[in-house]
């Protein structure tokens, strides 16, 4: 065995061992580690606050898909005013003829005021008010007996015309 590996190591000056030295404090020895830990904790807290705030926003706003959006067409009767009906079909109550911009003046008398606004007039009719209960006489309307080939080839559009609310896909399919 080599004897040089087993030789005791002595301090150069015996006074170094005997001098009173204070041990450094925990904060001074681990200051860098503590600062890094504080910065990491602050970053984690900021990320958690951001994640929870975005979840609350998503939960508060209902998830609306394209199929759930309904479009209400206030000019439902008026947009088809130029098209002539098919023979054998009758005009729905409250439908206009060719007077798109003119108010309907020959309505049945009701206790509700006439607004000349198609949106509110249709809402009054849809809620089952007095206007919906008393249907106008058939003498007020004249039906045209001309042949309309375009409406014969589009039964889906005709079905949409009868409804008051439309989905996004219905509108795409009708175009």
Swiss-Prot record:
Main location group: virion
Membrane topology: Single-pass membrane protein
UniProt keyword list: Apoptosis, Host cytoplasm, Host cytoskeleton, Host endoplasmic reticulum, Host membrane, Host-virus interaction, Membrane, Microtubular outwards viral transport, Transmembrane, Transmembrane helix, Viral envelope protein, Viral release from host cell, Virion
Keyword hit for Transmembrane helix: yes
Gene Ontology biological-process entries: microtubule-dependent intracellular transport of viral material towards cell periphery
Transmembrane segment boundaries: 32-52
Signal sequence extent: none
Location of the region described as Disordered in the Swiss-Prot/TrEMBL record: 79-121
Compositional bias annotation for Polar residues: 79-89
Expression triggers: Expressed in the late phase of the viral replicative cycle.
GO cellular component: host cell; host cell endoplasmic reticulum membrane; host cytoskeleton; membrane; viral envelope; virion membrane
Annotated region (Interaction with host DYNLL1), positions in chain: 141-153
Nucleotide-binding listed as a keyword: no
Cell location: Virion membrane; Host cytoplasm, Host cytoskeleton; Host endoplasmic reticulum membrane
Quaternary structure, from the entry: Interacts with the host light chain cytoplasmic dynein DYNLL1; this interaction is critical for intracellular microtubule-dependent virus transport toward viral factories.
Reported function: Inner envelope protein involved, through its interaction with host dynein, in the intracellular microtubule-dependent transport of viral capsid toward viral factories. Seems to induce caspase-3 activation and apoptosis. Plays a role in virion morphogenesis by recruiting and transforming the host ER membranes into the precursors of the viral envelope. Involved in virus attachment to the host cell.
Similarity comment text for this entry: Belongs to the asfivirus envelope protein p54 family.
Name of protein: Inner membrane protein p54
């Amino acid at each position: 065995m080599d004897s040089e590996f087993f030789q005791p190591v002595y301090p150069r000056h015996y006074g170094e061992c005997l001098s009173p030295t204070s041990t450094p404090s925990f904060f001074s020895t681990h200051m860098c580690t503590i600062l890094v830990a504080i910065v990491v904790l602050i970053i984690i807290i900021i990320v958690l606050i951001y994640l929870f705030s975005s979840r609350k926003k998503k939960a508060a706003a209902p998830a609306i898909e394209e199929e759930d959006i309904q479009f209400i067409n206030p000019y439902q009767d008026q947009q088809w005013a130029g098209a002539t009906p098919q023979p054998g079909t009758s005009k729905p109550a409250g439908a206009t003829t060719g007077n798109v911009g003119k108010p309907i003046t020959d309505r049945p008398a009701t206790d509700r005021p006439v607004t000349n606004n198609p949106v509110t007039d249709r809402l009054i009719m849809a809620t089952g008010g007095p206007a919906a209960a008393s249907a106008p006489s058939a003498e007020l309307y004249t039906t045209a007996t001309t042949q309309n080939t375009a409406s014969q080839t589009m039964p889906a559009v005709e079905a949409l015309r009868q409804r008051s609310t439309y989905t996004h896909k219905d509108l795409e399919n009708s175009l």
